[in-house]
Swiss-Prot record:
Similarity annotation: Belongs to the RutC family.
InterPro entries in alphabetical order: RidA, RutC-like_sf, YjgF/YER057c/UK114
Gene Ontology CC terms, in alphabetical order: cytosol; mitochondrial matrix; mitochondrion
The keyword NADP is annotated on this UniProt entry: no
Keywords: Cytoplasm, Mitochondrion, Transit peptide
Gene name of this polypeptide: mmf2
Purpose: Plays a role in the maintenance of mitochondrial DNA.
Biological source species: Schizosaccharomyces pombe (strain 972 / ATCC 24843) (Fission yeast)
Protein known as: Protein mmf2, mitochondrial
Localization per record: Mitochondrion; Cytoplasm
Length: 126
């Protein structure tokens, strides 16, 4: 089994990991958040969701895939009360047919202390 690391030069990693790994015809994306130019971008849950999905789209682009090829999405929210507002942006940005999805109220995510409200990881087909 081969593992091919994927990293976009437009995004930065916040730790010792790859932004994605290609293996077995699938792309496994690490969690993305509302980060631009290496810095967290505070904002509403809608703004953070939009930027987070844009970051995932960039990683998928570099991997040779796209949001259209998503098969599974995991969303981590710091506050489940943000679910409906996050969902509005999610529905707007992701094409049908929608991927399988899990959304969890995680309480804290790595950027919580800076105001981070959401982290999204995904699996896509090549």
């Amino acid at each position: 089994m081969s593992k091919v690391p994927i990293n976009s030069s437009k995004l930065s990693c916040g730790g010792p990991y790859n932004q994605a790994v290609k293996s077995g015809g699938l792309i496994f994306c690490s969690g993305q958040a509302a980060v631009k130019d290496g810095n967290f971008v505070p904002g509403t849950i809608q703004e953070q969701t939009r930027l987070t999905i844009e970051n995932l789209a960039e990683v998928l682009r570099v991997a040779g895939s796209s949001l259209e090829k998503l098969v599974k999405v995991n969303i981590f929210l710091t506050d489940i009360d943000d679910f409906a507002a996050m969902n509005e942006v999610y529905k707007e940005m992701l094409p049908d047919p929608m991927p399988a999805r899990t959304t969890v109220a995680a309480g804290k995510i790595p950027l919580s202390s800076k105001g981070g409200k959401i982290e999204i990881e995904c699996i896509a087909a090549e």
